[in-house]
Amino acid sequence: MKTNKILATALVAFTMMIGTSSFAQKEKTVMVGGAAMYPSKNIVENAMNSKDHTTLVAAVKAAGLVETLQGKGPFTVFAPTNAAFNKLPKGTVETLLKPENKAMLQSVLTYHVVAGKMNSADIAKAIKAGNGKATLTTVQGGKLTAWMQGKDLYISDENGGKAKVTIADVNQSNGVIHVVDGVVTPKK
């Protein structure tokens, strides 16, 4: 009887181990900033692991948007890299991170977020339906324009600024991230 209990316990443990292992193998990851992005983690959890998004993470924290971007969503986030933030005029990031500029920072960050999950195929379909351009309404309320140049996907803001999607379709538990090489800004 004791042997049967031990065997049953071992069988249950082995089954759970195999189940967990096969889940980890089925989870398709994408490398961003030297770290694996796991579809079972949310936008903030994954962004915090990317060495290419430390400025974005600091900005999300300063803007008080961590809880929002950890929420259910789904969200489509066009995530600027550190290099994208470095392209801004000198002192811009430091100014935006000041507590007195929290509302402005929130506006810039939420301008990079679209409600719903739009992978690159969804965006390409919208571009085709829009005769070469798609208008995306951001959580901030402004508009982004998406278009293709060859096989590359771009977004542009209402001021003429643009960003190229360098890594598309980084799936998250609460949406999708598209890594971009520029910071887009809402209408001035």
Stretch-by-stretch model annotation:
Residues 1-27:
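Bacterial Sec-dependent N-terminal signal peptides
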